[in-house]
Amino acid sequence: MKKTDELRTIRIDPLITPAELARQYAITSDIMDTVIATRQNIARIMTGQDARLLVVIGPCSVHDPIAAVEYAHRLYELRVKYKDRLEIIMRTYFEKPRTVVGWKGLISDPDLNGSFRVNHGLAVARKLLLDINALGMPAATEFLDIVIGQFIADLISWGAIGARTTESQIHREMASALSCPVGFKNGTDGNIRIAIDAIRAAKVRHLFFAPNKDGQMTINHTSGNPYGHIIMRGGRAPNYHPDDINSAVKHLREFDLLEHLMIDFSHGNCLKEHLRQKNVSKSVSYQISHGSKAIFGVMIESFLEEGFQTVTNNQPLIYGKSITDACLNWKDSVLIIEQLADAVDARF
């Protein structure tokens, strides 16, 4: 029989439905309360009703659930300690966008060996989010694949759209449907206009096609997300300095958008040298302590151990060390959080 379709598809595997995964790993009432309260807190911080600073911190990507839970335990202690000045949320990224190729994250390849046991990856990710939230530690993630959100979005307090997908129409439409506040990164070249356009697009109603929780293809009609914001992540040059922030605020004002933004300490802002995140923190803390109201949040790449490691066949991995972007170690992370908390004192 002749075919004109699926000619380059090697195989098609069955995928668990979001509803079935949620039955196996069910959200509890206490976790619901954590997620709802955190989303509300972020909205209040964004709109200037809460003077605290949002801090999204954690590993570049999650590859080891055990190490991630240990990190969450440690971070929760800081969340409690600084709760009057900071709203600390753990970065739990399960999908990795790639410029060309590479490991695409815990959900796609949980065994780190190219076996692509996606159903297992989804289960590991959802269980991990339940474990982290059960501690009272809210979770943040990047939404890359537009279907994966159906499996985990109920456990996410803050979401991001990455620099490579901010300009994508379907990601803007998806953001308009998400129940959490969503940050849009500026382009990899530093262009902030695409992020501002994304905020404007996600703010209004859309319709798009996607499977529902039971796997049935549906037409989604969205109400729009009022809590979109820009994440300044640098580009060809850093963009966390006062002039960069003032320029971004001016552009936000032109479109009557919330004049608050988030600073990513990593990526282009640290010139891809992870230790420079400490320099970014020093500058941002200075700006906050000297009256900057525009900076409502920051993002930091941090793990138990400093740096990164390469996955090699038959070689054990160093516990608590990133396998994607290099991260700050725990000691430096504690110092940065303390520095940010001290800076926020000026707002009270």
Swiss-Prot record:
Q: What Pfam family is a match, any one?
A: DAHP_synth_1
Known EC number: 2.5.1.54
The UniProt similarity line reads: Belongs to the class-I DAHP synthase family.
- GO CC, one annotated term: cytoplasm
Source domain of life: Bacteria
Q: Which NCBIfam families match?
A: aroFGH, PRK12755.1, PRK12756.1
Query: Mind listing the GO biological process terms from this record?
Result: amino acid biosynthetic process; aromatic amino acid family biosynthetic process; chorismate biosynthetic process
Protein's recorded name:
Phospho-2-dehydro-3-deoxyheptonate aldolase, Trp-sensitive
Q: Which organism is it from?
A: Buchnera aphidicola subsp. Acyrthosiphon pisum (strain APS)
Q: Which reaction does it catalyse?
A: D-erythrose 4-phosphate + phosphoenolpyruvate + H2O = 7-phospho-2-dehydro-3-deoxy-D-arabino-heptonate + phosphate
Job of this protein: Stereospecific condensation of phosphoenolpyruvate (PEP) and D-erythrose-4-phosphate (E4P) giving rise to 3-deoxy-D-arabino-heptulosonate-7-phosphate (DAHP).
Q: Which UniProt keywords are given for this protein, alphabetically ordered?
A: Amino-acid biosynthesis, Aromatic amino acid biosynthesis, Transferase
Instruction: Specify the pathway.
Output: Metabolic intermediate biosynthesis; chorismate biosynthesis; chorismate from D-erythrose 4-phosphate and phosphoenolpyruvate: step 1/7
Q: Name one GO molecular function term.
A: 3-deoxy-7-phosphoheptulonate synthase activity
Q: Does the keyword Amino-acid biosynthesis apply?
A: yes
